[in-house]
Amino acid sequence: MKVLALRHSVAQVYADTQTYLHDDSKDEYENAFLISNLTAHNILYLNYSLKTLKILNKSGIAAVETQSPDELFALIRCNFTYDYENNIVYLHDYSYYTNNEIRTDQHWITKTDIIDYLLPGWKLTYVGYNGKNTRGHYNFSFSCQNAATDDDIIVEYIYSNELDFQNFMLRKIKERMTTSLPIARLSNRVFRDKLFPSIANMHKRVINVGPRNESMFTFLNFPTIKQFSNGAYIVKHTIKLKQEKWLGKRVSQFDIGQYKNMLNVVTTIYYYYNLYHSKPIIYMLGSAPSYWIYNVKQYSDFTFETWDPVDTPYSTTHHKELFFDKDVMKLKDDSVLYIDIRTDRKNMDWKEWRKVVEQQTVSNLNIAYNYLSTGKAKVCCVKLTAMDLELPITAKLLHHPTTEVRSEFYAILDVWDIITIKRFIPKGVFYAFINNITTENVFIQPPFKLKASPTDYIVALYALSNDFNSRQDVINLINKQKQSLITVRINNTFKDEPKVNFKNIYDWTFLPTDFELKDSVITSYDGCLGMFGLSLSLSSKPTGNNHLFIINGTDKYYKLDQYANHMGISRRSHQIRFSESATSYSGYIFRDLSNNNFNLIGTNVENSVSGHVYNALIYYRYNYAFDLKRWIYLHSIGKVAVEGGRYYEHAPIELIYACRSAREFAILQDDLTVLRYANEIEGYINKVYSITYADDPNYFIGITFNNIPYEYDVKVPHLTLGVLFISDNMIDEVVAVLKEMKTELFKTEISTSYNYMLFDNVYVANASGVLSTYFKLYNMFYRNHITFGQSRMFIPHITLSFSNKRTIRIESTRLKINSIYLRKIRGETVFDMSE
């Protein structure tokens, strides 16, 4: 959903669009709630309130103020991520395909021959980090840039087994045009760029678990963040390899050597960060022209000092000369050294060339060892070739993708490696490594151990659900970690599957009820975005690879109606009820009937079940941005801080009734996951509320009326407003509650329109308009620790006779209350009051 705010209506009609006119009779929160439950994707919001827009954005729903038709058209034609704190719109708009254009934010790609392999007549455009260079295309009242690129396709091609780039690109563009937009993945870079500066500013010690290549630039500005990944491939792991020969396989049609060099250097930087927690100077020998340096500098400020006879235009300092072993003394401490020296083959035959390469490999290693043997805080990444060689058993081997699989690979060495044991590795083993292993991640830090760390803030995005982790250990970590942002895969299956397939692995699945948390928010991706200054124009799909975002130790926990709130809680219900259901009242009718309340007159205004909890359960796949457990808990302890809107405090029994309705809904739909979720939420309600039942009551509250429009043969027809189980010394407390509620009780608009047999030999009249007052009275008694109400549904009725009679219908008749009293069952009246 996206909300586009306008001061004036527009003549143009757009598909999947509704118009909402601000209702001045309601406050900003109520207007926001009504907007959030509209069913169209595009909402044109007229006569808007800025506060309402802010409320929607904090809820994760993109709401943007537009000042011109051009702005409206730009936003209505595509999806986007909105930085509402800085008023920046990041479009995810691929309409540039209509210009026969693909886009990249990787500068090095523009310096390759990729254009020879594009679709006929197509071009490549560099758009800068997150499309920053496109800002000039949009002369808008808000900052706007198109973050859409085709880098995901290019990178997927590089790591694939396919060689024909044009066919690969064509297939992927067609897939993009025929499948739903993966909005979470596209907006994730924007999210990370907001998230980590925020966390790093507030917490000195930050742990990040499971970063992948898409985050390779995000963390360049955060050397103190401790990374955990899947670990490095080290020399001693090669013992498992069988010897092979040179393969000579082409990986990419266009030259990706610069990409390989960039990955090597970035891998080395992060390895350095994990050791020394600061930014190094970056020395590079060879690898000119290194256009990729421009990319790195767009994200973070580094000093690059380079040696190569060929120009390196983006280096900070370039020495247009060769580097020799004696020059090592020029290199300072607190640095990384990338050695990529390789003489051009020119016209040498392969045997002579092989000798030169092996000599250079030995020379490169000597430079590396000399560099690491003196000074402090140093890491080296060195180019090697497959040959009989001794290497430290702890050296980290790299084989990032390059244009052709030939003989080269790289090793990362630190100051400890050069003093450790070395092992002789034959050439064939290195070929086996090169032929079969591709380094897929620039983060090669050791794996994370699933243990809470009280002094750290842990971030684990899409990293812990894999089934090689113990599911219970993941739950324990989340329960015990005081400060964290951790995601786990949501169980949105229908058969309550404990794990589901994802690519070539399996993920554990989770529901919010799997965790026992306080001061934590459990929400969706868009709900989480709202907490960090972002909002989204497109929610996650209800099925597929979706995640719960669990934020521990957030200062937004008590801001119940601002973050992870009830916005959109009824949207799916509206979509169903106003399109394919038997009646738009279907939800109300089902909730009453499933709790054995057969009086459906006015069911849409006087329902016996919490619609919030019911919708949050049966449609949780659509609206899990709403943190139901937090909502229940804060109500149970009386700490609900509400800024605005129509606030109705539910009685705990209403929540129980909702769970029962949801359970029956799940059984009818054969939805085993909702069935378990409803059962567990009911258990949670009973845990946090101290609910007691007057199933063996000794007192009741009765209401008598001045006018009963039916014949009756009981002595005094009355409405039982509830039963109690109390000791005699609690009578004064009950009376005090009744006196406090007196005005509201007598203002209750009770009406009747038919009579019926409640049980055999119990003839009663219906009583409408009672439930709202009953639940308020229930809450009053609950807060005063007085047992009121039974475990079964309260059905308001007036007993007329203890004999069997036929149903009679009349025009709805208002009943005038005569008196309200407290009486002992089979005893005397102990309190009576009249208006």
From Swiss-Prot:
UniProt domain comment? Contains a bipartite N7-methyltransferase domain, a 2'-O-methyltransferase domain and a GTase/RTPase domain. The C-terminus contains a phosphodiesterase domain that degrades the 5'-triphosphorylated, 2'-5' linked adenylate oligomers produced by the host cell in response to IFN stimulation.
Subunit structure, as described in the record: Interacts with VP1. Interacts with VP2.
Name it.
Protein VP3
Instruction: Write down the Pfam families for this protein, in alphabetical order.
Output: Rotavirus_VP3
Q: Give the species this sequence originates from.
A: Rotavirus A (strain RVA/Human/Japan/KU/1995/G1P1A[8])
Q: Which domain of life is it from?
A: Viruses
User: Which keywords does this chain's UniProt record carry?
Assistant: GTP-binding, Host-virus interaction, Hydrolase, Inhibition of host innate immune response by virus, Methyltransferase, mRNA capping, mRNA processing, Multifunctional enzyme, Nucleotide-binding, Nucleotidyltransferase, RNA-binding, S-adenosyl-L-methionine, Transferase, Viral immunoevasion, Virion
Name the Gene Ontology molecular function terms of this record: GTP binding; hydrolase activity; mRNA 5'-cap (guanine-N7-)-methyltransferase activity; mRNA guanylyltransferase activity; RNA binding
